[in-house]
Each structure stands twice: as structure tokens, then as C-alpha cells.
Amino acid sequence: MRHLITTKDFNKVEIMELFKEASDFLDEKPRTFLKGKSITTIFFENSTRTLSSFESAARRLGARVLRLDVSRSSSSKGETLYDTAANLDAMSPNAIVVRHANSGVPLILAKHIHCPVVNGGDGKHAHPTQALLDLFTIYNHFQGDVEGKKICIVGDIKNSRVAASNIELLSRFNLDITLVAPPHFMPNTHLKKHYKLDENIIANSDIIMSLRTQTERHNKTVYASLKDYANDFCIQKSLVKDKKLILLHPGPVNRNIDISDEMMSDERTLVLKQVKNGVAIRMAVLKKLILENEG
């Protein structure tokens, strides 16, 4: 049984096949590949973009979607994760998409469910479809010429599952990664590190990936206010100037904290393209896992 728990679950050949399929899906036309199939979404953490993206992807493939309301589910009343898995399995879905605040939950569910499980984000651990859509966006922009491209990841890297998945995936495709964050947001890593964002770093980057500060994952207050953080790490036109690059963000964007209003409206900022690409990538992932499982 194939699952997508981390980006490591797909090899490079499979990822390139996903990109080819996703490129076809960018026309937004409805398909019938998953007609008669059922996909269950169960998000134990709040989500608007990822949940909507997966559900749009499923419906465009012709599948039915069952969204489980966790706030009213038995899990909120003390049901164990194993019982939740057993009950989900008893509904005989063709795939389950799960998000959870605790790292490792999608993997635990995958061991007790007889259909593909897709990780929609677990704790600080992984967010594989976000990393895939980010690389897909980069790949399309540079027309496949991504090896050696310099990417600067800025923000709360230590607490970001998006950063964790991107670092694994982008390293495999030989992008040159630099991390920029305050010391308390910086993970232990062999990658190049800077503790302040400046013009020289941006001048040497082809891609900037800004991240949201994960205040809900902080055990203590790090900054008196997010404005203090923004003074050092907000992506602003005065820093970027006319540099030829692209700016990415997984969303939601804290305007004037992560990225300035001016840069959000800049044509180099591809946040909305990431959203569009996300639906196409998730279509490709769901189609691959479900049809391979039944083949």
C-alpha cells in the first residue's frame, strides 16, 4: 500500500511524472479518473487553503468527498487514534487526507487503514504536497532548469513543516539552499545559515521562500510584537529592489510581517500561482495513489 507521508515516499522519477500530470491538470477541466471513488478528509487542525485545495482536487477528478467534522467527532470526546482509524477504515474510503497537530499521526493511521493516506500536514514534521507544489512552481518558472538555483528560506524555519519538507525535496533536486532566521527559529543543520536578512543575501538568490511565524507552536513569547520580527525579516521592496527572482509563501501570509503589501502585489510574487498549482499537484497525487492501489 502506497501512502504520501513525507516527500521521501516518491522518488525523483515519480515526482517528474507527477509534474507532467499536474501540468495537464492546470487547464482546470473536470476529469472522470476517480468517478465513483470516495475521498475522506479529516483535519484535526484548522485549515482553509489545504483542505479546500484537496477537496477541489478530488472533485475535479470526479470523486466524492466526505469531510469529517473533527470538532463534533468522537475523537474530541476521548476516542483513541486507533479507534478513529478503525472507524475510518470501516467506511471503505479510497483515500484519506489527514492533518494533525502532532507529528507522526498520519503514519500511525496509515498502519491501520487499508487505503492510501495522504499527509496534509503533521506538527512540525512534514507537509509533502506543499513542498511538491512549491518545487512544481519553481520547476515551471525556470522551465525545468532548477539544478543549482539559489533559494533563500526566510522565517520560522525550526517550527515549519513546510520548511522541513522543502529542505528534503529541494536538496534532492540539487537546489542551493540558504536559511535566514533569528537564532531561536533556526534548526540544527549543515545548510548555510544567516541570522539577519540583508540586500546581499537577496542579491544572490533566485528564489525567496518566506514563511509564517508559527506562534501557535512557540512555548514562550520570543518577540514583544511581530512588528519587531518584521523589522529584520519582512520581505520588502527596499531589500529586493529590481532583482530578478521569484517570491513564494505557503500561506496564509501575514502582510507586512512576512511580506510587505508592496511586494504582495509585485509580479515576482507567485503566491496565487502556488495556490493554482497546488490543486493540480494534489490531483496528480490522489490519482496516482488511488489508481495504483487498485491496479
UniProtKB/Swiss-Prot annotation:
Its EC number is 2.1.3.2. L-aspartate binds at K77, R161, R212. It catalyses: carbamoyl phosphate + L-aspartate = N-carbamoyl-L-aspartate + phosphate + H(+). The keyword Transferase applies. PROSITE patterns: CARBAMOYLTRANSFERASE. GO terms for cellular component: cytosol. It comes from the Bacteria. Pathway: Pyrimidine metabolism; UMP biosynthesis via de novo pathway; (S)-dihydroorotate from bicarbonate: step 2/3. It is an enzyme of class 2 (transferase). One of its GO terms (molecular function) is amino acid binding. Belongs to the aspartate/ornithine carbamoyltransferase superfamily. ATCase family. NCBIfam families: asp_carb_tr, PRK00856.1. HAMAP family: Asp_carb_tr. This is Aspartate carbamoyltransferase catalytic subunit. The gene is pyrB.
